Protein backbone atom coordinates (compact mmCIF):
# COMPACT_ATOMS: atom_id res chain seq x y z
CA UNK A 1 0.00 0.00 0.00
CA UNK A 2 1.23 3.49 -0.86
CA UNK A 3 0.00 6.35 1.28
CA UNK A 4 0.34 9.90 -0.03
CA UNK A 5 0.51 12.63 2.58
CA UNK A 6 0.18 15.97 0.79
CA UNK A 7 1.34 18.35 3.53
CA UNK A 8 1.20 21.39 1.27
CA UNK A 9 -2.20 20.52 -0.21
CA UNK A 10 -0.91 20.93 -3.75
CA UNK A 11 -3.80 20.07 -6.03
CA UNK A 12 -1.59 19.81 -9.12
CA UNK A 13 -0.32 16.44 -7.90
CA UNK A 14 -2.31 13.44 -9.09
CA UNK A 15 -2.05 11.40 -5.92
CA UNK A 16 -3.89 8.40 -7.37
CA UNK A 17 -1.45 8.09 -10.30
CA UNK A 18 1.53 8.54 -7.99
CA UNK A 19 0.27 5.89 -5.60
CA UNK A 20 -0.57 3.42 -8.38
CA UNK A 21 2.82 3.73 -10.06
CA UNK A 22 4.80 3.39 -6.85
CA UNK A 23 2.73 0.38 -5.82
CA UNK A 24 3.75 -1.31 -9.07
CA UNK A 25 7.42 -0.40 -8.49
CA UNK A 26 7.38 -1.86 -4.98
CA UNK A 27 5.62 -5.01 -6.13
CA UNK A 28 7.73 -5.64 -9.24
CA UNK A 29 11.20 -4.54 -8.12
CA UNK A 30 10.93 -4.81 -4.41
CA UNK A 31 9.40 -6.83 -1.70
CA UNK A 32 5.92 -7.67 -2.92
CA UNK A 33 3.18 -6.06 -0.88
CA UNK A 34 4.82 -3.44 1.33
CA UNK A 35 3.72 -0.17 2.84
CA UNK A 36 5.29 3.06 1.64
CA UNK A 37 4.55 6.59 2.82
CA UNK A 38 5.16 9.44 0.36
CA UNK A 39 5.17 12.87 1.95
CA UNK A 40 4.87 15.98 -0.21
CA UNK A 41 6.42 18.88 1.70
CA UNK A 42 7.65 22.45 1.36
CA UNK A 43 11.24 23.71 1.22
CA UNK A 44 11.45 24.55 4.92
CA UNK A 45 10.48 21.03 5.97
CA UNK A 46 12.80 19.22 3.58
CA UNK A 47 15.67 21.58 4.45
CA UNK A 48 15.16 20.77 8.13
CA UNK A 49 15.11 17.02 7.42
CA UNK A 50 18.21 17.33 5.23
CA UNK A 51 20.01 19.25 7.99
CA UNK A 52 19.04 16.84 10.77
CA UNK A 53 19.65 13.56 8.91
CA UNK A 54 22.27 14.40 6.27
CA UNK A 55 23.98 17.39 7.91
CA UNK A 56 23.30 19.50 4.81
CA UNK A 57 21.58 22.79 5.62
CA UNK A 58 19.88 23.20 2.26
CA UNK A 59 16.67 22.04 0.61
CA UNK A 60 16.76 19.07 -1.76
CA UNK A 61 14.31 17.40 -4.12
CA UNK A 62 13.82 14.00 -2.46
CA UNK A 63 14.87 12.15 0.68
CA UNK A 64 14.30 8.50 1.57
CA UNK A 65 14.02 7.13 5.08
CA UNK A 66 13.99 3.34 5.44
CA UNK A 67 11.89 1.91 8.23
CA UNK A 68 13.68 1.52 11.52
CA UNK A 69 11.43 -1.19 12.90
CA UNK A 70 13.30 -4.04 14.60
CA UNK A 71 13.61 -7.14 12.43
CA UNK A 72 11.52 -9.09 14.96
CA UNK A 73 8.48 -7.00 14.04
CA UNK A 74 7.18 -8.65 10.90
CA UNK A 75 5.63 -5.59 9.29
CA UNK A 76 6.17 -4.99 5.60
CA UNK A 77 6.92 -1.28 5.88
CA UNK A 78 9.55 0.08 3.50
CA UNK A 79 9.75 3.59 4.90
CA UNK A 80 9.12 7.15 3.79
CA UNK A 81 9.90 9.08 0.63
CA UNK A 82 9.80 12.84 1.21
CA UNK A 83 9.50 15.05 -1.87
CA UNK A 84 9.74 18.83 -1.97
CA UNK A 85 7.17 19.99 -4.50
CA UNK A 86 8.74 23.47 -4.79
CA UNK A 87 12.19 22.08 -5.63
CA UNK A 88 10.73 19.59 -8.12
CA UNK A 89 8.84 22.44 -9.80
CA UNK A 90 11.98 24.62 -9.98
CA UNK A 91 14.03 21.75 -11.40
CA UNK A 92 11.37 20.87 -13.96
CA UNK A 93 11.38 24.46 -15.24
CA UNK A 94 15.20 24.69 -15.28
CA UNK A 95 15.52 21.31 -17.03
CA UNK A 96 12.61 21.92 -19.44
CA UNK A 97 10.68 18.91 -18.17
CA UNK A 98 7.04 18.35 -17.37
CA UNK A 99 6.39 18.85 -13.65
CA UNK A 100 4.44 15.58 -13.41
CA UNK A 101 7.14 13.60 -15.21
CA UNK A 102 9.86 15.01 -12.96
CA UNK A 103 7.73 14.35 -9.87
CA UNK A 104 7.26 10.73 -10.97
CA UNK A 105 11.00 10.42 -11.54
CA UNK A 106 11.80 11.74 -8.05
CA UNK A 107 9.20 9.44 -6.49
CA UNK A 108 10.60 6.40 -8.32
CA UNK A 109 14.16 7.46 -7.41
CA UNK A 110 13.30 7.77 -3.72
CA UNK A 111 11.43 4.46 -3.72
CA UNK A 112 14.36 2.65 -5.33
CA UNK A 113 16.57 3.87 -2.48
CA UNK A 114 14.20 2.16 -0.04
CA UNK A 115 14.45 -1.01 -2.12
CA UNK A 116 18.23 -1.03 -1.69
CA UNK A 117 19.43 0.79 -4.80
CA UNK A 118 21.99 3.56 -4.51
CA UNK A 119 24.27 5.78 -6.56
CA UNK A 120 27.34 6.09 -4.36
CA UNK A 121 29.73 4.63 -6.93
CA UNK A 122 29.62 4.86 -10.72
CA UNK A 123 28.48 1.28 -11.35
CA UNK A 124 25.64 1.50 -8.82
CA UNK A 125 24.63 4.91 -10.21
CA UNK A 126 24.45 3.47 -13.74
CA UNK A 127 22.39 0.48 -12.55
CA UNK A 128 19.98 2.72 -10.65
CA UNK A 129 19.64 5.20 -13.52
CA UNK A 130 19.01 2.35 -15.98
CA UNK A 131 16.29 0.92 -13.74
CA UNK A 132 14.71 4.38 -13.38
CA UNK A 133 14.67 4.73 -17.17
CA UNK A 134 13.08 1.29 -17.55
CA UNK A 135 10.36 1.99 -14.97
CA UNK A 136 9.58 5.45 -16.34
CA UNK A 137 9.47 4.17 -19.93
CA UNK A 138 6.78 1.67 -18.85
CA UNK A 139 4.57 4.61 -17.87
CA UNK A 140 5.36 6.68 -20.94
CA UNK A 141 8.02 8.99 -19.51
CA UNK A 142 11.10 9.56 -21.65
CA UNK A 143 14.67 9.31 -20.39
CA UNK A 144 14.87 11.78 -17.48
CA UNK A 145 18.64 12.22 -17.77
UniProtKB/Swiss-Prot annotation:
One of its GO terms (molecular function) is metalloendopeptidase activity. PROSITE patterns: UPF0054. It holds the Pfam family YbeY. Its EC number is 3.1.-.-. Signal peptide: none annotated. Its cofactor is Zn(2+). InterPro entries: MetalPrtase_cat_dom_sf_prd, YbeY, YbeY_CS. Zn(2+) binds at residues 109, 113, 119. GO terms for cellular component: cytoplasm. It is an enzyme of class 3 (hydrolase). It is found in: Cytoplasm. Keywords: Cytoplasm, Endonuclease, Hydrolase, Metal-binding, Nuclease, Ribosome biogenesis, rRNA processing, Zinc. One of its GO terms (biological process) is rRNA processing. Binds 1 zinc ion. Belongs to the endoribonuclease YbeY family. NCBIfam families: rRNA maturation RNase YbeY (TIGR00043). Single strand-specific metallo-endoribonuclease involved in late-stage 70S ribosome quality control and in maturation of the 3' terminus of the 16S rRNA. This is Endoribonuclease YbeY. It comes from Vesicomyosocius okutanii subsp. Calyptogena okutanii (strain HA).
Amino acid sequence: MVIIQNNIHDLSVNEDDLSCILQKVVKEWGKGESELLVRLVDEAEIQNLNKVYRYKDEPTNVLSFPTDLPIEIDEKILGDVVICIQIVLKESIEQHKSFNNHLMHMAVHGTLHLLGYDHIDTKDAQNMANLERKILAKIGINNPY
